[in-house]
Every structure is written in C-alpha cells, then in structure tokens.
C-alpha cells in the first residue's frame, strides 16, 4: 500500500514559510493566546512541506480549480498534419501542432519472430528500446527537443467469444505479455526553446518545421544504427487510432469514454508492472529530455468503472492533462518492449511461459497436430485475431467466434497467418515441443494444456 503522505522541499515555499513564521509568532506573543502564533507557524511549515498523494495542500486547491474550469470544455484537438520534405529526396515527415508544441512521430518497427519469455513476472525479449539511448541521441543531435515514447495496445482482444477470452485471461494470468502493442516516439518542439536552432533554417514556423523534420530523420537514422528499426511517420493516423479512448467527459478520478472508462495512473514499477494490469486497452507514455529524469504515466481503459491495480496510484484531478501528456510523474530509465508479445505457444523446461508475435509479418504456419491447431487458433482468437476456418469446422467456429471461408487463416490488424502452405512468404513450424522460425530454427518448448481447452478440440470434425 502506497503511503499517501510525503515531504517535498522547495526554495520558494521555504522562503515564504520562513518569512511568515516570525510575524505570526510576534503578533500573538503579548497576548494570552501566545500559542496561536506557534500553531500558525507550524501550520505554515506543514502546508509548505507535507504532500498528500504527491501534492501540497496548495497544489490540491490549484488542481480542483483547474479541473472545475476545464471539465465542461471539450479537449483541445491537434491541428491538421502537414507533410514536409527533408534534404533527402522522397523522405517525408508529418508535423502538426499539439497544444503549444510542434510534434512529429517516429514509428518503431517490431523485429519479426522475436519471442518473449516471462521469468518471475518479468518479460525478457530482444525487441527493446532503452530510454537512456533516446536521451543520449537527443543530447547529441537536438538538445532543445524532448521525446515521448508512447506504447499502445491490449493484453487480450475482444473479437472472440467471451468464454474464449475469459479462458485465455486465466491462462496468461498477470504475465506482462500484451497480444498487441505498437510503439512510437513523439518528438516535441517548443517554439521558444528551439528558436535559435529553427532560425538557422528559416524564419518563423517554417524554420521550426524544418528543424523538427530534420531532427526526426536524424533520430530515426541513429536508432537504426543501434539496431532499432525506426521510420518517420508520414501521417498521424495510426498513432491517433491506437491512442484514441473515445473521450466524452473528464471526471475527478477517470475519463468517461463512449463505451468505456479510462483512468490515468503513476506506476513506478516500469513496463512489467504496466502491462501486467488487466485492461481492455493500455497506453504508456515515457517522456525523455536531455538532463532531466524520465517521466511517465499509464492509462488503463476498462468496460467497467476502474479499480486501482496493485502498484498503481491514481492521478486524481489530472486525468485529462495525463492523457495529453501534461501531467507526468518522475520515474527512471528503463528498457521498453517495442512490439507485441503475441500468443502463448508453450513454456521452457523451467516452466517459464513463451510468447511469439504473429501480427507483424505474413507467414505460413505449419501446425503439428490437432491439439496444437486447437490451442493456437483458440488463443489467437482470444488475442484479437479474426479467425477463418473451413466449412467442416462449423461447430468449432461457433464456439470460438470464428468465420467460415475457403481459406484457413488468422487475420491480425497488420498481418495474416495462413494455416497451411502459401507461396511467397516465410514458413513457421509449431509443434508440441518446438517452434521453428526463419530467425530461430529450433526453439525448444513444452506444451501448456489447461483442461478447459479440451472442449474446443472435441468440437473438431472427426
């Protein structure tokens, strides 16, 4: 349980308290209520130094006032994006105004066939971005910019039958293994801070846009040289779609959406804590700026009114600012997973769950037997894929919420997994004891077989 009380020292509050304390004591010194002056001075020290859930009393008053002012207003929308060319022919980067900042987006491309292994509640994968690397690149190439590393996704999907989704949630438990996740770096340029750098390229907004575009291109190139595939965004469509929560109204402790609720939290535990919390949609934001400690916030969207997960702290009175990246909490540098963890395919000999993503590249999947076929299709449906099976699987399709078609496949938002031979694409083999990919020829695994999944195998045609 987090202790709601804390201490915070600042020069301004200390000077104000030290200036007011002596007059308060002197004013009551010659009266019969001499103790009142000491009490007022002590109260001033408490107001200046003691915090309650991260804010002083004055901070809570300001938060309530700000919330009352904005709660009736719709959120400010971003400007229409403009695409500007850099000095490299054909390399376009979209920029737009977001509040007082001009922003550009860099999408991080997941590394195909990268498994995630969960060991003692921690996700181990090669597909990672070090926030310290981003700060280093900013310091070298554009020290007057700041970057938001934004990841959005979900642990389980909502396209399958409810029983299938519920069963898969029980199987994966609290593993920090989202079925779907995409990551972007949003570069933010403050016109005042970047004035000198922008004026070297052009006057006014044109110079600022050119500086931001050139910086985004340079950061993407440097990330690629460090093994992180990054592409400058030509539009904000994918980013906006992934981070949309259907905002309707801000409340004191949550945001009411069109058909769900979203709550903003501080969670110092890092991505393993953030992605282990049950939610229909998760958005994480880590802000990095040269010479400053990273700041972060987490937004969890649920169908019902949210309950604060263990290790999280609700940002009362600051829900909309957290959504817009204006209310972040100090954190530390960490390794952020880039792509999806994917579907549970088995476990190691030490009983550590193994997940494999299938949503980033088209493949032809060869499944070893009926049980492996059943487990993969059921779990893929629970992970948010649209499953299509043949007409002979009608009963099976009805149980899991699949479609009937001539081609057996699993359709992800950005890729398709064909359950059989398919020309022109990579081939993956999944057996009860091994998974083979173009990257890992033979990755030993053991089957994970919860008894509840057997009912779906019984629905297969004999």
UniProtKB/Swiss-Prot annotation:
Its cellular-component GO annotations read: plasma membrane
Origin, by domain of life?
Answer: Bacteria
- Annotated disulfide bonds: none
Topology in membrane: Multi-pass membrane protein
Q: Does the keyword Transmembrane apply?
A: yes
**Main localization (coarse):** membrane
| Keyword field | Cell inner membrane, Cell membrane, Membrane, Transmembrane, Transmembrane helix, Transport
Q: Which family does it belong to?
A: Belongs to the EccE family.
Its quaternary structure?
Part of the ESX-1 / type VII secretion system (T7SS), which is composed of cytosolic and membrane components. The ESX-1 membrane complex is composed of EccB1, EccCa1, EccCb1, EccD1 and EccE1. Interacts with EspD.
Tell me the lineage of the source organism. Answer: Bacteria, Bacillati, Actinomycetota, Actinomycetes, Mycobacteriales
Q: Which NCBIfam families does this chain map to?
A: T7SS_EccE
Annotated transmembrane regions: 9-29, 34-54
The subcellular localization recorded is: Cell inner membrane
Q: Which residues form the signal peptide?
A: none
Question: In its UniProt entry, what is this protein called?
Answer: ESX-1 secretion system protein EccE1
Q: Kindly give the Pfam families that the UniProt entry links to this protein.
A: EccE
